[in-house]
Amino acid sequence: MTRRQTLTLVAAILGSGVATIDGSIVNVALPAIERDLGGGLTGQQWVSNAYLLALASLILIGGSLGDVYGERRVFAIGIGAFGVLSLACALAPTIETLIAARALQGAAGALVTPSSLAIIIGAFSAAERGAAIGAWTAWGGIAAIVGPLAGGWIVDQVSWRWIFAINVPLVIVTLGLILAAVPPAGARSGRRVDVVGAILCVVGLGGVVFALIEQPNHGWSSPVIFLPLVVGVVAFAAFVVYERRAKEPMLELELFTHRNFAVGNVETFAMYAGLGILFFFLVIFLQQVAGYSALESGLATVPVTVVMFALSRRFGALADRHGPRLFMGAGPLIAAVGIVLLLRTGLDTSYATDVLPAMLVFAVGLSMTVAPLTATVLADAEESDAGIASAVNNAVARVAGLIGVSILGVVVAQTLVGDTFAANDESVRAFHQVVVVCAVLVAGGGIVGVLGIVNPRRTVEARNCPGGQLVAVPLPAVESTTAAD
């Protein structure tokens, strides 16, 4: 590996790591943010969802901008903006200001996430990319462990504001590396950005999710809820119609005529809706109901990342050898069993007996699922569509978690006393409702996999698929390695 390649890889790891961790590290700080700035459960949801909504809504256009203007330029602009907006989050005087800054931060992350892996692919030859992507994935897993731990410690010992401020020096280092290591490239002719599709997608998702989150405060009959909901549904329908006719669509709808691609994305949606709900509400429950500190709640989910880091590649290799269908079916069912074990939690929750066993069983099931699922989706797309196929799968995973948390927020708010979790029986009952819904969604994903997945037209090495961080959200781009019809 040359010096330039090493610097490029480090820059990509730092950039994607900062953007990804900021989507999850904030969860351990939500109770502290609520105590400082207010906002109740709705405010907590929006601090998390504003970032995820912007990231998921714009990630496809972020990839398109990289194709048109060059990944180096888009990555540098994205990571620079991310640093500025991290500082804005750290200095936010109100919950509304923080939510706005988080939304803009998510937009910057949508530029960084797809371009980081594209930069690696451009810097390494085909023979070298496997090792480079493996290093990128491995360090992403390590960052996923360190991030929540460091976030919990920072919240307990200093202030929640520093979980955002700490990004600034990392961004400065990343900018220096990327500008020094990656040569500039001009805009690429013949490519256009699907601006209309991007706007329709953002309006569609934003309207629907806003209505779901704010409904408990206003009711369905309020114009504040009804109008955004209608606008969102109409805009998303228009997005689908427009993408069918666009010459250069943001989303290639033809991909969904491929069976494994379509079924795999349905399983992805079910799985990651359940995972997004679980991790959002578990951290809040452990802190506000079970009495854990921010650091302790961050530590609670570390076994999931450790097990996945140890087992995902091994299960990916087994799926390459025996086919993905078994793993895409059995894995989610095992993960669902782990989730059900969280029904043992209550006001007096023991980590060793009530939480840890659930996390371990859940992690084994998730490890069986993620790499085969990602590989199968990619294998059912043409070689020329591998990038967009990965981006779609990434977006489906992120949007699923976003919608899942929004809908469950509506349900849970009906059970809670005072729109927030507290150490009472109503909060325990609300969390157990969340657990059941998560288990059903994840198990449903497994059933979809068993019934719908067939052997792909060509094989993608699952063990080489980048698996994401804490909950292994699929990340953009992976290379097909063999052809088998």
Where are the language model's segments positioned?
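12-transmembrane solute porter fold
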Residues: 5-21, 26-28, 41, 47-48, ...
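Flexible interhelical linker loops that connect adjacent transmembrane helices
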Residues: 127, 173-202, 244-259, 320-321, ...
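Transmembrane-helix bundle of Major Facilitator Superfamily
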Residues: 1-180, 311, 315, 321-322, ...
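Membrane-interface helix caps and helix-loop-helix hairpins in membrane proteins
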Residues: 95, 159, 186-190, 215-221, ...
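Intrinsic disorder in cytosolic terminal tails and internal cytosolic loops
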Residues: 1-4, 452-485
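C-terminal membrane-cytosol helix-exit motif in multi-pass small-molecule transporters
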Residues: 168-187, 202-214, 231-246, 445-455
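Juxtamembrane C-cap of transmembrane helices in multi-pass membrane transport proteins
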Residues: 210-219, 377
